[in-house]
Amino acid sequence: LISEKESRYEREYSSHLYSESEKSAINIKEVYPKYSNETKLVDGREIINKYFFELFENNPKVFAVGEDVGMIGGVNQGFAGIQEKFGKYRITDTGIRESSIIGQGIGSALRGLRPIVEIQYLDYVYWALQTLSDDLSTLQYRTRGGQKAPVIIRTRGHRLEGIWHSGSPMGTLINSLRGIHILVPRNFVESVGMYNTLLSSDEPGIIIEPLNSYRLKENLPTNLSEIKVEFGCPSILREGSDISIVTYGSMCKIVMDSAEQLQAVGISCEVIDVRTLLPFDKNDTILNSLKKTNRIVFADEDVSGGASAYMMQNVLEKQNGYYFLDSKPITIHSKDHRPAYSLSLIHISEPTRPG
């Protein structure tokens, strides 16, 4: 009887936090990037810029607003040349008012448009948190799916550029914004796939582009407009047998470099990129890795008790991963203070690879 009541109340009072329609982002399947024999190696910023040109050309409902996105093409040039080609009504500079930027996105999305609203750096999301939390993340829930505002919030963060430009407050976002997809790409091909998935859905999401990857080289796919990332499906970046290391975003490169160093001394690491924090690992990919290695580390750039603790709870408690442990699970995270500006001192504040 108790079980039946719990099931009924779950449906009555906990439904519609996320979309339950056929266009729910969770239903959209992976479409992998394709490469030709003449594939170019380009900066990450060139990939996202080329994608935005194709997107604005092909989808007249898409427009963008944010600080410096128009005239100068964004602080990292992702929108370079877009305003010149498509005009000020399609991509518009705003004042320094993050809450207002989000509000513009909510209103236009409710009217059927597909806004990309830019918060210049992840640290500045705090100034829009009340609007994101009270208005956007609750919209489908409090209207029982009756209203939808599929806003895409574009921002950047994690490593680089000191106290105000390199924050990684992922725990804050995870705990405040249930109802919004929290997406943490490791590179710009992944970012493109996440934009396409959101644009194919009827839900909002926040994409946190890796700040230190705009000038890192990537292969340019031939099918940018088609790539999709399946939310809740981690990627195994490196197979191993001794320990599972779970991470995301900018930390993927750090962990991969560290795994290479550990391999040299006989330690085989399996490296897993979660890709999306909300939703998190819907197919138990991390649990299956833990069953093989029996040891696990969760690594990120948030403070202690942040996203690393969230990932640990999901794997050990919700997926019952504790049963397969042969040693204590570990979290690797940043210090509880803000990061230093000097790159030579970043190892004091944030996780870095040895050497």
Identify the meaning behind each predicted range.
Residues 81-88, 172-177, 254-272:
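Short helix-loop-beta junction
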Residues 143, 262-267, 318-325:
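Short helix-capping segments at alpha-helix termini
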Residues 346-355:
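Single conserved hydrophobic/aromatic residue that forms the stacking wall/gate
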Residues 3-213:
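Thiamine diphosphate
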Residues 47-55, 168, 189-205, 213-264, ...:
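Glycine-/acidic-rich phosphate or pyrophosphate-binding loops and their flanking alpha/beta elements
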Residues 300, 308-331:
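Catalytic-face loop-and-helix region of soluble metabolic enzyme cores
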Residues 268-289:
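Generic long, charged, amphipathic alpha-helical segments
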